[in-house]
């Protein structure tokens, strides 16, 4: 992945809510909206084709990592869906 895609991946992973494209653009002031959207597509494709348990989705006017639907029931049963934060 490109450096920008990795930066977006890290920010989205750390976020507790969906992040808008404008918020993601603020991570790299030199990157315009088109560049950020291309990097988001790169991250999304990486997670779509890599056999991961999470996926990058566009929801609520923003982007967020979510567990794949096929794991939702097991995660709900385990009752540990909230993960601890790292700074």
Protein language model features and the residues they cover:
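Short basic alpha-helical hairpin corresponding to helix-turn-helix/winged-helix-like nucleic-acid-binding
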Residues: 42-87
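Short capping segments at the starts of secondary-structure elements
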Residues: 11-20, 31
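Long, charged, low-complexity, helical-prone intrinsically disordered regions
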Residues: 1-3, 17-18
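Short amphipathic alpha-helical interaction segments
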Residues: 31-42
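Short, leucine-enriched amphipathic alpha-helices that occur as contiguous helical runs
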Residues: 4-8, 87
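A short acidic, leucine-rich amphipathic alpha-helix
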Residues: 21-26
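Alpha-helix C-capping/helix-to-loop hinge sites
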Residues: 11, 27, 78-81
């Amino acid at each position: 992945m490109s450096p920008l895609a990795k930066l977006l991946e890290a920010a989205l992973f750390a976020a507790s809510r969906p992040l808008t494209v404008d918020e993601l653009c603020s991570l790299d002031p030199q990157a315009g909206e088109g560049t950020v959207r291309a990097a988001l597509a790169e991250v999304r494709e990486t997670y779509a084709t890599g056999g991961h348990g999470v996926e990058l989705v566009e929801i609520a006017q923003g982007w967020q990592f979510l567990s794949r639907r096929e794991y939702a029931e097991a995660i709900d049963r385990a009752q540990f869906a909230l993960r601890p934060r790292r700074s």
